[in-house]
Amino acid sequence: MHTESTLDTTQADRTTLRPMRATDLPACHAMSLHLHWPHRLADWQFHHQVSSSWAVEQEQPDGTLNVAGSGMLCRLDDDYASLGLVIIADALQGRGLGRAMMQRLLADAGSRNVILNATEAGRPLYEKLGFVVTDTLSQHQSTTASAPATLPAGTHIRPLRPD
């Protein structure tokens, strides 16, 4: 059973770790866009459906609640799980929220071997939790130019076929 818990941070943080709701996904997606991650909202929705998903919620001075962190663990089978989409808002980093999120996700993994795809920013925390780098991946992103509105005379576009 998943329950909410007030995180052990300063009183001013007013944060809670709770199961993620579908209504949190646009805010999670916005956090990933802020980090220049390539995930679409549809990717977040898919991962939420197949994963144990958690959110850090922060109460603002006016009483409104904002999603300020995320993390997901997908159980691949009885032996393996994949952990990712771990984000803590910039303003809350360095307060132990990333560690609390990781501990919650690792508890959800149980005895499974956990695979973690992560950014360099989280590496110090992940290594403190026992993760070791086994390989690295470089990600390249670009924005594509729009196709011209009209094709030059005599130019045709057709489906590519093996014939």
Positions of PLM-derived features:
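Conserved acetyl-CoA-binding loop-helix of GNAT-fold acetyltransferases
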Residues: 88, 94-107, 124-128
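Conserved GNAT acetyl-CoA-binding A-motif
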Residues: 81-83, 108-120
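Short loop/turn motifs at secondary-structure junctions and domain boundaries
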Residues: 44-50
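Conserved catalytic-core motifs of GNAT/GCN5-like acyltransferases
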Residues: 113-117, 132-146
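Conserved beta-strand in the GNAT
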Residues: 55, 63-74, 81-87
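A short beta-loop-alpha structural element at the N-terminal edge
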Residues: 14-27, 154-163
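Solvent-exposed, charged amphipathic helical/linker segments at domain boundaries
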Residues: 145-157
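Helix-loop element at the rim of GNAT/NAT acetyltransferase active sites that forms part
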Residues: 22-25, 30-42
